[in-house]
A protein has these predicted regions:
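A generic structural signal for short beta-strands and their flanking turns/coil linkers
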Residues: 29-31, 57-59, 64, 94-99, ...
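Short N-terminal secondary-structure initiator segments
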Residues: 1-11, 75-99
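Acidic, metal-coordinating catalytic segment for phosphate/diphosphate chemistry
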Residues: 1-41, 114-124
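Conserved Nudix-box catalytic region and its N-terminal flanking loop in Nudix hydrolases
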Residues: 42-91
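Short regulatory "switch" loops immediately downstream of catalytic or recognition motifs
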Residues: 34-40, 83, 87, 104-108
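Generic secondary-structure boundary/loop-capping signal
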Residues: 19, 23-25, 60, 65, ...
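Active-site segment of metal-dependent pyrophosphate-handling enzymes
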Residues: 87-126
Length: 126
């Protein structure tokens, strides 16, 4: 079975070669999320980070992150990625109108910005 890449929640798919071509030509929107659990006073008690294997096989911490799909709001993308990466018991409370604390641009060219993604030009709302 060929791996395919989802681009919207209605079931449209791009073949991997087509997605690679799109990534070469278009900036892709992403969300970077740092989910936290707070106590009744609003103090942070827990931070939701992921453990992933790096390219050299080491286990590293990573933030929840992923693409925004076609016809998906930023809020929906945040909730989807938190549930996908941290599980349904994460039960995120996402603000009605989330506001990013920063915007990061990832470029395929090293040194073009502090952020590098060799696959694409990505714009990430953090």
């Amino acid at each position: 079975m060929t791996s395919r890449t989802a681009v919207d929640s209605e079931g449209s798919w791009f073949e991997p070669d087509h997605m690679t071509e799109l990534r070469r030509r278009l900036p892709i929107p992403y969300v970077d999320i740092i989910p936290v659990r707070t106590d009744v006073d609003g103090s942070v008690e827990e931070v939701g980070l992921l453990l992933r294997a790096s390219g050299d096989g080491q286990i590293v911490r990573a933030i929840v992150s992923g693409r925004v799909l076609v016809h998906e709001t930023i809020r929906e993308a945040i909730a989807r990625h938190i549930e996908k990466d941290l599980g349904p018991m994460a039960m995120p409370r996402v603000p009605v109108s989330p506001v990013p604390f920063t915007v990061a641009e990832y470029f395929p060219t090293p040194g073009a910005s502090p952020f590098h993604d060799p696959r694409q030009h990505a714009i990430s709302l953090a």
